[in-house]
């Protein structure tokens, strides 16, 4: 039995920084961690966790959608974590597509949001935020209390049931509360019978499989076309 916790969010919001603090806090509380980092190009983030003494594996999706890649590798990730004997398995996503939601029902799903981005940012995150169990607001040291409350309100409009944690990932402020939340989360014994919380976007157009030419004649599979209003003024 182990806890499996997903950290999703856009690029450069501070997922790795927050998670580095969390694994350290959990170690102090007697819980061992393992980390799986999904990325597209570079696997350098795994060295951040290995420097903390945390078993870490990196998956590079390359030309494949990283969130589709993650879901396709859940059985293998689970088997790897079995060999590490960890109490908590953290999975950090690549953070590219705001529409994707690789969380499953048995995971504890978290969404990391940059508090400095915009008060409208939460409304653009889709299932990544709306299906999350908890939300981490990062860079809160760079905004006022009033601005923080506005962002929290925007998060609640999308996901009113999520626990919200305000974190300064540079100093570690707020990480203790997040660590206690994860410590109290339920453990699961297997991925068997697990299902995604939300369907993935279709990924079967001609460009998904390597087409480079532009034009309707070269578009096959699931192709979405815009509708243009006659009066756009």
Region locations from a protein language model:
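Structural beta-sheet core signal
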Residues: 35, 111, 135-137
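Short, surface-exposed amphipathic charged segments that create phosphate/polyanion-binding patches used
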Residues: 71-76, 176-186, 206-211
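Inter-motif core of Ras-like GTPase G domains
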Residues: 95-116, 126-133
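Nucleotide-state-sensitive switch-loop elements of NTP-binding domains
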Residues: 2-13, 17-104, 140, 173
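Conserved ATPase-coupling elements of RecA-like P-loop NTPase cores
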Residues: 98-104, 120-123, 144-150
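Hydrophobic anchor at the start of a short beta-strand
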Residues: 32-33, 56, 109, 162-164
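Canonical P-loop GTPase G-domain recognition
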Residues: 134, 141-197
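P-loop NTP-binding site
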Residues: 1-17, 23-28, 189-233
């Amino acid at each position: 039995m182990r806890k499996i916790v997903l950290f999703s969010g856009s690029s450069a919001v501070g997922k790795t920084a927050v998670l580095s603090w969390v694994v350290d806090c959990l170690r102090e509380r007697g819980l061992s961690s393992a980390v799986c980092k999904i990325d597209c190009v570079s696997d350098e983030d795994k060295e951040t966790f290995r420097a903390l003494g945390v078993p870490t594996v990196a998956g590079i999706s390359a030309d494949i959608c990283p969130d589709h890649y993650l879901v396709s590798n859940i059985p293998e990730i689970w088997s790897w974590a079995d060999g590490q004997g960890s109490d908590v398995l953290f999975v950090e996503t690549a953070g590219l597509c705001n529409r994707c939601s690789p969380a499953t029902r048995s995971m504890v799903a978290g969404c990391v949001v940059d508090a400095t981005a915009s008060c409208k940012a939460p409304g653009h995150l889709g299932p990544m935020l709306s299906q999350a169990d908890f939300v981490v607001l990062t860079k809160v040291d760079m905004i006022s209390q009033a601005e923080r409350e506005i962002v929290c309100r925007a998060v609640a409009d999308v996901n009113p049931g999520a626990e919200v944690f305000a974190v300064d990932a540079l100093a570690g402020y707020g990480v203790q509360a997040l660590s206690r939340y994860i410590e109290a989360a339920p453990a699961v014994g297997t991925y068997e019978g697990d299902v995604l919380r939300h369907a993935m976007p279709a990924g079967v157009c001609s460009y998904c499989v390597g087409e480079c030419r532009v034009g309707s004649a070269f578009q096959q599979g699931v192709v979405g076309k815009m509708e243009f209003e006659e009066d756009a003024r």
